[in-house]
Amino acid sequence: FRHNKSSTNEKGQKVPKVYVVNRPTRNKFGWTPDLSDAARYGALEVVFEPNDQPQFVPAQAPQAREIMKDFSSEDYLLWPGGGDPIAVMICCMIASEKAPTVRVLRWERNMEEGERDRRKGWYMPVALELRK
């Protein structure tokens, strides 16, 4: 799910995108985050791949800017965890340049028998008004 070129629906309306900061990989808990629930908010578009290191490869920041060139207040940012923390910062800065309000998808874990199960849950949208 990278570089989805279709940005309008059959009625010609802009379809929101979910910009995934980095493609999920197996985490320290031994499982890979499932982004299927995030797809209900829009087409998934990966910004950074697992081997990308924008902290050490300056050319990757302009690549992210190109991928996110059409980011708007109707779109979402999603960080699935892991990856280069600088990638998160780059995506947030690009999003804030493009839109006064940045919507993010936050993972809400299910409560099961008093404990939160990291593998089960849903994405909750949060709007961050960064400027008026």
Report residues per predicted region.
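Long, low-complexity, Lys/Arg-enriched
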Residues: F1-Y76, M89-K132
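Acidic, metal-coordinating catalytic cores used for nucleic-acid/nucleotide bond scission
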Residues: W79-M89
